[in-house]
A protein has these predicted regions:
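Hydrophobic residues within well-ordered alpha-helices
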Residues: 1, 55, 105-106, 162
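Short, glycine-/small- and polar/acidic-enriched structural segments
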Residues: 1-49, 117
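Sec/Tat-exported extracytoplasmic proteins
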Residues: 4, 9-12, 19-22, 46, ...
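Phosphate- and divalent-cation-binding pockets in alpha/beta enzyme and binding domains
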Residues: 17-18, 73, 122, 198
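Generic beta-strand structural signal
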Residues: 40-41, 56-60
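Pocket-lining segment of extracytoplasmic ligand-binding domains
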Residues: 48, 58-157
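An extracytoplasmic/periplasmic, membrane-proximal ligand-sensing/linker region
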Residues: 149-210
Length: 210
């Protein structure tokens, strides 16, 4: 909105916020294929938690307040399951980061938490979480998440070149492999603002848009 940034990597919720602040002019160019069907994982180290009903009266950790996958979508999904975090949890914490949420749960600081599936998979792969203690007990339905967004007044030709550069990235190409690995992307695909209307509706329902 202040024209200080030409391009940014945004989560679904932060894109919605950017879109509203720029009066709908921000343009989402591309997203990872994984972001077209993103999910969040609910985790616990408590044997007594088998489902959402068991969360009532328990302590719970979200990620950052502005996180799509660590707060907004999980909060909305909890509401769909009849759980009001502000009313039903004994205490609600914001860890600030997905890996911190796992650390909170593993250390027993909270009874349960939620994080994005990509980070969970990475931590499991890197053996940075003890899966004999911490387990996934629920997964959200899929939703659109991260994207690369540009200012709406950026030269359309430059927008097209940027989009094409992402779409040409190939994980099988050694020259592209490191970039793709850093983004944990199998490939990039085009996206559009309409894909994030569901997130905007969820944010409004959760009272997170002012």
């Amino acid at each position: 909105a202040t024209r200080k940034i030409d391009m940014a990597w945004l989560g679904g919720f932060t894109f919605v916020q950017a879109s509203l602040r720029t009066r709908g002019t921000a343009v989402p160019l591309v997203q990872r294929a994984e972001d077209a069907r993103f999910t969040s994982k609910f985790i616990t180290a408590s044997e007594g938690i088998k489902g959402f009903a068991d969360l009532k009266g328990k302590t719970f950790a979200f990620g950052a307040p502005s996180s799509t996958s660590g707060h907004l979508i999980p909060r909305y999904f909890l509401g769909q399951e009849g759980i009001n975090p502000d009313r039903d949890f004994k205490n609600t914490a914001f860890s600030g980061a997905h890996d911190a949420t796992v650390a909170f749960v593993q250390a027993g600081k909270v009874d349960a938490g939620v994080l994005n599936a990509s980070v969970w998979d990475k931590l499991v792969e890197q053996k940075k979480v003890d899966t004999t203690k911490v387990r996934v007990f629920a997964t959200t339905p899929p939703y659109f998440d991260y994207n690369w967004t540009v200012r709406g007044d950026l030269d359309p030709k430059l927008q097209a070149r940027l989009r094409d550069a992402f779409l040409k990235l190939d994980a099988a190409n050694p020259a592209h492999k490191e970039i793709m690995a850093l983004q944990r992307a199998s490939k990039f695909i085009p996206t559009k603002a309409e894909n994030y209307k569901g997130i905007e509706s969820a944010a409004q329902a959760a009272g997170l848009l002012k």
